[in-house]
């Protein structure tokens, strides 16, 4: 496999390289040292680590990007770049946390004095620059952003915002799956038979369609990334920033996807979709099987150098559908509309923006948000998502990349000030052998790529979409849905 060829164009702001050094060299290439490491024990030829229950496992920082509003257009690029630098600061602080366990054991103030304190100072400097850039561009920056500079350390068994089940270590504190990376752990998995039917309890990701209103659908077949288009950029959240995602994305549809792609590039690109009028970009973090495979990105930022290791698993099927609203007709999406659904930082941010849903084929009435399912033989692992489908009627993006779109309410309606557009629903099916979970350990687990400090938690799953359908095709999609027909 190989990643796409980057164009390396210079954006309005200076290109920012968001990266962190690899921490340790292991049998699978450059990998991250285990985040709990406090004492080592040999077990069956593996150098395992055992955790201390009170030890800091990861770093929890307020998400400044979600608190920013009303950024003038001419400051957007600079602000996005500063936010990407903050992400790199967290990655580097996590690196420091993971490689200083011996010092931490001998000094109860080590984490605060040498990691969290300096991190706060660096974040404060960037927040000051963000405020200056917003004000200089004619906006009014929030004077209280400085309150978000401080971060805290916390053990892995604390997940902000609750969830269906607790996450983290097992009661014995065993955390090393044998691959030397920070997660997943045994407690991140659940037998699908143990999940109660219809128990997914989230206000996000409800289906917009139903028996009434606009009952049609439009299916677009864009393959399963046969062209091996991968990179660790995020064109929506971090335009102009190399490795802005800190994890590898899997792309279908538009074939010109990297941090430096302009709207013109997207419009002129090839597409993997059978309907050549659909040049939209659909992307999500890859799933990997942590089996020791050295992938093409084993030594790269966003890959093995940031703890995302193992064999990349392509979906056996990627079903992409647009559906209507059970409350009435839908209107066309504007071209280049950008939508992020789910939250790549929801392990530390909490579940306010989370939109993960895991299941197994044949068990789709059982959906789980914060666990990976263990599926029986012959059953596929499923990742499903229903995007936000309420548009503010004006903007193709917003300062925090969320405010211009909203999820449907419980009755399928949009809140005041929003109008219904076709809802994007994606269903990814994977052929994955079930990991072995035994005695509080997991062997050959699969996991979603993540920011290093997010510990590969399943609740961090997310999807991204940029609408690049031509006007005729978008009108066809809307007409089909509103007429109650199933088209493709």
State what each model feature region is.
Residues 66-84:
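Short, charge/polar-rich alpha-helical segments
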Residues 108-120:
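Short, charged, amphipathic alpha-helical segments
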Residues 118-135, 157-160:
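Amphipathic alpha-helical coiled-coil segments
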Residues 141-167:
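Proline-directed phosphorylation-rich, low-complexity intrinsically disordered regulatory regions
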